[in-house]
Amino acid sequence: MKFIVKLFPEIMMKSKPVRMRFTKMLETNIRNVLKKVDESAKVQRQWDKIMVMVPDDRPDLVEAFGERLACIPGIAHVLQVNVSTFTSVDDIYQQTLVAYKEQLVGKTFCVRVKRAGKHDFNSIEVERYVGGGLNQFTEAAGVRLKNPDMTVHLEIDNDNLYLIDKRIEGLGGFPMATQEDVLSLISGGFDSGVSSYQFIKRGSRTHYCFFNLGGDQHEIGVKQVAYHLWQKYGESHKVKFISVPFDPVVQEILERIDNGQMGVILKRMMMRAATRVAQKMGIQALVTGEAMGQVSSQTLTNLNVIDRCTEQLILRPLIAMDKQDIINLSRQIGTEDFAKSIPEYCGVISQKPTVKAVLSKVEAEEAKFSEDLLDRVIADAEIIDIREIATQMDTKITETETVDSINANEIIIDVRAPEEEEKSPLKIDGVEVKAIPFYKLATQFADLDKDKSYLLYCDRGVMSKLQALYLQEQGYTNVKVYRP
């Protein structure tokens, strides 16, 4: 059994040196991926295709090889074939009859032949001869050249006959590492996962930069998304995962920045931090999952203001895509379930965000930041090889107890941002409620009465749980999540 790997058409259109470079890289990528499945994998490059050989004594590898080949960038489609030699056109027919006789019962069919090499016949002659024989000596319903029930595909390469057993659609795009590296800003949601995939498919080694706003549980969820994308579509090359602790930035934004400017300024700070990471890694472009008009910070005016904070190239592959199309693609690539479980943070967005930010006003607000703010968060950033995530996933995160009722000796802590808490304060008869924003809780919790139990509350129950997990990691056992 063999696989014939067909190159993506855009590769075929390249000049001879570029096409050769792309094909060599694809051969290497295929070998790197399949060797992880089984060391016996053999890959052979030819001018217009790549051959993958499956050992005769290992039929169990056929399905696994096919699945991996379907996810390697640069492949148009893969043909799963049985290989034999032939002596004449009639010999081709006889072999085809044996292979397809049972499959053709009651079906209309046509025969399609591709041929390479010197022969005393052409492709059409083979199609007519084989098709006529199959029509006469099988129980097929007849020949139909347009829209048949079944197409018999044959390929002839010199004296080799390839009986095509199965066609597997490929990923398309360019082979990994034929384009320059990019740094993708990943949050774990629908958009950033799909935008990362788009650049993997286009041949860029895609590294991941995550801005951590709320603890280990969120980070682990995002790492799972990044690891899935790398393992399924980009495993042929090593990439990095960078985690930047961004809660100090969020804290200063919430304490010092005008409410309407928060969203744009948060994005600008992320771009600045990502630029520093990218420059440190020698990467020239950032990738984001922003789509025009999807949220308030993604108007063209705001995107323009965001881009002014850096000279780094910012690429937005989803800029004109509809949200449903993005979700559909996330389902196709396997990130939808991850995205559904990734939290959206309450209290990190403006109550009345501007849709037409003015650069001068934004810069005036940014002057309120501590001078060393970005230096501090970049210094604390963690850079790991993405392969290390697999072992980190085995780390067990303590489950936080969630309650819907309040007992004696329990105090509720409202961890929402001040604007949200003031807009709809939490009031429960006979129960003490303390308002401590999530970004201050870590530093103020130690000052609270240790003989009391504390129930953390926020609208969505996400930030409260993450803060509870964080406090538990610090050794506090008197904390739960309150979800009425």
UniProtKB/Swiss-Prot annotation:
Residues noted as binding ATP in the record, renumbered to the chain? 185-186, 267, 289, 298
Q: Where is the signal peptide?
A: none
- Domain of life, per the record? Bacteria
Listed CDD domains: PPase_ThiI (cd01712), RHOD (cd00158), THUMP_ThiI (cd11716)
Q: Which GO terms describe its cellular component?
A: cytosol
Domain Rhodanese, first and last residues per copy: 406-484
Q: Where is the active site?
A: 458 (cysteine persulfide intermediate)
* Broad enzyme group: transferase
Subcellular location as annotated? Cytoplasm
Query: What EC number(s) does the entry state?
Result: 2.8.1.4
Q: Which GO terms describe its biological process?
A: thiamine biosynthetic process; thiamine diphosphate biosynthetic process; thiazole biosynthetic process; tRNA 4-thiouridine biosynthesis
Identify the residues that the record assigns to the THUMP domain, covering every copy: 63-167
Q: Which InterPro entries match?
A: Rhodanese-like_dom, Rhodanese-like_dom_sf, Rossmann-like_a/b/a_fold, ThiI_AANH, ThiI_fer, ThiI_N, THII_Thiazole_biosynth_dom, THUMP_dom
* Pathway(s) it belongs to: Cofactor biosynthesis; thiamine diphosphate biosynthesis
* Disulphide bond pairs: 346-458
Q: Which Pfam families match?
A: Rhodanese (PF00581), ThiI (PF02568), ThiI_fer (PF22025), THUMP (PF02926)
Keywords (A to Z) from UniProt: ATP-binding, Cytoplasm, Disulfide bond, Nucleotide-binding, Redox-active center, RNA-binding, Thiamine biosynthesis, Transferase, tRNA-binding
Q: Catalytic activity, per the record?
A: [ThiI sulfur-carrier protein]-S-sulfanyl-L-cysteine + a uridine in tRNA + 2 reduced [2Fe-2S]-[ferredoxin] + ATP + H(+) = [ThiI sulfur-carrier protein]-L-cysteine + a 4-thiouridine in tRNA + 2 oxidized [2Fe-2S]-[ferredoxin] + AMP + diphosphate; [ThiS sulfur-carrier protein]-C-terminal Gly-Gly-AMP + S-sulfanyl-L-cysteinyl-[cysteine desulfurase] + AH2 = [ThiS sulfur-carrier protein]-C-terminal-Gly-aminoethanethioate + L-cysteinyl-[cysteine desulfurase] + A + AMP + 2 H(+)
Q: Name one GO molecular function term.
A: ATP binding
User: In which family does this protein belong, per the annotation?
Assistant: Belongs to the ThiI family.
The role this protein plays is: Catalyzes the ATP-dependent transfer of a sulfur to tRNA to produce 4-thiouridine in position 8 of tRNAs, which functions as a near-UV photosensor. Also catalyzes the transfer of sulfur to the sulfur carrier protein ThiS, forming ThiS-thiocarboxylate. This is a step in the synthesis of thiazole, in the thiamine biosynthesis pathway. The sulfur is donated as persulfide by IscS.
Indicate what this protein is called per its UniProt record.
tRNA sulfurtransferase
Q: Give the organism, scientific name.
A: Shewanella halifaxensis (strain HAW-EB4)
Q: Which gene encodes it?
A: thiI
